[in-house]
């Protein structure tokens, strides 16, 4: 009888989606943006993607080997970090800087804080911001030459809007991806296809990206360089890393709130900060720093947004 009633320790109810399965879903969802980036920028984009992924996976394996910790590279989280970081890099970036960004993202941002589930900021964004600070010139070099011919030369659409106005860009090209930019941010259509895949697979819900995008749109409509201009707002939405950040980085399970209201507040914070950086900052972008700063606010957001337990009454009422 004792064998009949012997049970293992909890948990007894398990979801079908493990970490590696979720990470695989994210990789699949990033394929449209990755493939378009390779098509748009050539095989050097593929080289940067593979190199950055290899850098992240190798960094995680080496760190865990040194500290005698069980290897976690099979959960694919390092692959996702490497892929996201690569999609946030300009294709002309020197290869060793891409490697350095991957090492920083994994060892400093992720492993030094205890590994997956313990990091306070998105590792890919941490790696990108490190490279932006350390190698600003290379991270803002979007000149692309193929077979001696300039494919893309000059500023990104956001820089053109900031410096020359809305008439200097074509929103249709921004939707398709025929613009300068990082490997994975140029095609809004490819990013949205990936976002739909993640939504259908249940990887993310729309609370964070929707509140992020709506808040940013309202902010730019009210305070942007061309106030009350819908076309200007659409161009700002399509430019830069907003869509990639809203759907693939702000929704990171580890660094975003878990409560429904917390997710909305977090998205609002991201939207406001991105708007502030774009309107009043020296750089035309702002998504990476906005999400990282919002990551730092997550503990406070969780505290103020946690639902009250059923039956709990406020202290003031208990004393009455």
Describe each PLM feature range.
Residues 1-53, 57:
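N-terminal signal-anchor module of multipass membrane proteins
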